[in-house]
Curated annotation (Swiss-Prot):
InterPro entries: aa-tRNA-synt_IIb, aa-tRNA-synth_II, aa-tRNA-synth_II/BPL/LPL, Anticodon-bd, Anticodon-bd_dom_sf, Pro-tRNA-ligase_IIa, Pro-tRNA-synth_IIa_bac-type, Pro-tRNA-Synthase_IIa_type1. The gene is proS. Homodimer. Its EC number is 6.1.1.15. This is Proline--tRNA ligase. It catalyses: tRNA(Pro) + L-proline + ATP = L-prolyl-tRNA(Pro) + AMP + diphosphate. PROSITE patterns: AA_TRNA_LIGASE_II.
Amino acid sequence: MKASKYILPTEKENPADAVVASHRLMIRAGLVRKSSAGLYFYLPLGLKVLKKIEQIVREEMNSTGALEFDLPILTPSDFWEQSGRWSAMGKEMFRIQDRHDLSYALGPTHEESFSFLLKPLLKSYKDLPVNVYQIQTKFRDEIRPRFGVIRSREFIMKDAYSFHIDDSSLDDTYQAMRVAYRKIFDRCGLKTIPVQADSGSMGGSASEEFMVVSPIGEETLLLCNSCGYSSNSEKTPLILKKENGSAKFSEKKEISTPGKKTISEVSTLLGVSESETIKAVALKSEKKKILVFLRGDLELNLHKLHSLLKIADSEPMTDLEIRELGLIPGFISPIAPNDKIKVLYDRSLQKDFPYVVGSSKEDFHTQGFILEKEISGLPEFADVALAREGDLCPNCSSPLKAEKGIEVGHIFKLGDKYTKAFGIQVLDQNGKSKTLTTGCYGIGVNRTMATVIEQCNDEKGIFWPISIAPFEVSLVSIVKGEDQYSKIEEFYNVLINEGIEVFWDDRDLGPGFKLKDSELIGFPIRITIGKKFFESGEISIYNRKKDQEDSFVFSGFDDLVARVESMRQELFTELR
């Protein structure tokens, strides 16, 4: 491809609204342009990268025996009603009505559609297992799209769904997908960590996210350097490093705390650590009022709470709603007020420790409150607090380390949630009807592209892994006149005929501009032919990742091609 025939709108300045490297560089390198919040146009260079990632995904999926489909983006509301997710998906799902007032969703995921499609096609255990997938545009009405294509409202996703006669078969495919995902991300040049994760609205019994450690990540990972345990903090069981020792206040007594409603305010006033207090969190879901008590220095983990109570979402109660239950905001006692509210105690609490708690009385707290003495029939404590760095590994009890991560893939064991909802049964070996069990496996293609840039950039721009670079080789020519141009064109044609992907910057621009563009865009290999070649036969070849340039005297096209092939193989080998 010749740059003179290409759309190549590179930019010198960073876009004002771009706060992360991938967003800045995708705009500056001419890969994308913004349409509106969370929506992007893909230009030819950016589209080539996307298509290469898609092809890697397709090859690895096909190698496992998965079958590619293409389903409608519009999905009828009936499908979602049948699974119970029409309301559970909330406001993030785009919903539309046609001229006949029929409701549809712009698919954020396709469990329902594949279930509807495959129900009449799967009749016997002999038809199983089957793993189906598509690579398709998905939609999500993000409340705050940000970080460019990392969190956007429209994105390309590979979503796969497997159907099985039993859990053993499901586990075989789950493990095959786990291996395939590692291969996909390795081939894309990404270093990923599989971590245990919460299944969220997807449901199911097991779930792993493929995470890339990055300071811009929106997820917190907790990792153990001793045994290799890794988990999303949403899923990590809380095991505290140590419990409270002796308390400052052991005698039970009511204390005046005028206007002090927060844990920080109360602990500062009384001179106690936050871990010696009990925090009350009042929430409401669609059908429940919830009151959670946990140690004052900890945060509530909503994902654990929702999973435990089997609810889709919750939000804080207002002060008025709290008072209507007979409670005083900021001064709530751990004693359950009535049966109108679901009360939970986190396992971070010690039953025999004298805590500072709310007194159920305006401007008063109680010191020396011991749960097992004050609350009759104390229930079993639940794990609903958020684990943090320094808490203990659930496998080996070593301290956990926290890292930020970007999720690029996710695999689930869904069980029979959707096959039950859609009545998907087959005859087993004994001729009896059996409900199938399923798995789900997703990869964000655009997000993978952006995350590669987050890992592969420097002050000059992007340095693409050669497997997904828009072109493998950049040929930069610095010439005067038609004769010199024709000579460089001979080089270009030789490389093309050897099957090498070449982007020839033949624009009538200065050498500095061309060289900076090639480094900004991130072509893995650059060949520069200019004045020195026409004077002494000297050519330079540049490794973008190493930022290393070597010169040699041209001795023939075979030698040039051999040098390029050697560097290509070196760059591909680094991905294994």
